[in-house]
Amino acid sequence: MLQLILGGSGSGKTALLYQRIRTLAQAGKKSILLVPEQFTSSTEGRIYRELGDELSVMVDSFSFTSLAERILSAEGGAAVRTLTDAGRAVLVRRALEQLQDNVQYYYRHRRSAAFCQMAAQTIDELKSAGVSGTQLYDLAQSCGPEQAKLSELALIYQGYETLLAQTGMDPSDRLELAAGRLEAAQARGTMPELLQGRAVFIDEFDTFNAPKKRLLGALLASGASVTVALCDDGAPAEPGDLGLFSGAKQLAAQLRSLARKNGAEVAVPVLLRKDLRHQQAPGLAAVTR
């Protein structure tokens, strides 16, 4: 089941998440709290402050990356080597050398470390967007004057992926692999012990890239209760809306679609309307409205 907790900044979304986590912990039920990488340290501290010594052991906080590693440790794949940025740049150069005459624009840059690093970063961004080398090649055919360059980039991407399969994984591939392992476990009718009977709470995100969406989809398909807090005023989305909450509204719609695609129920969202952060300063509260 998916439930969204919606509200503006300072409306108490995170406080409500911790309240629900506490209630589950008091009932002897464990939870998982997913936050972005940069919030993992501060989240550990807040869990201890909010729940205390006895109840805090009922909660595990993860980033998507660390959760993926735990799944791989349980289901297999953790030992697969992950390439460094330097290793990924070397792989781009090797792909260029193998392509030779098939790439006219970019072959001469094969010995440029800066170009190879930039190409590796571009490939990483394409993966994050869920675009494969084949898809990029197909898209390039309708790009007019840029068709040739984009087609060559797609060939480099495809060559890179072929070499990567013989060498190791990109960091983003580990999330994809973890999602695949979780999907395979579900097909067998099993679940990693880490996820058995646990509610999942997600906070502090304003977007999810393609690998994270796949892992989130696998969690929803497992039947887990997934609660996501989003900075959204809860008003209906309007066509062409570019307002303050437009990104969150799009994300909320994507999450509801993802839940339904994976056979999960979508609960009625919780909407928090009060500005708790500025309740002692009504002037500031008026400015934020």
Each language-model region and where it sits:
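Short glycine-/polar-rich loops that comprise or flank the Walker A/P-loop
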Residues: 27-30, 56-59, 196-197, 222-226
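Glycine-rich P-loop/Walker A and Walker A-like loops and their local beta1-loop-alpha1 context
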Residues: 1-48
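Conserved RecA-like helicase ATPase core segment
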Residues: 212-289
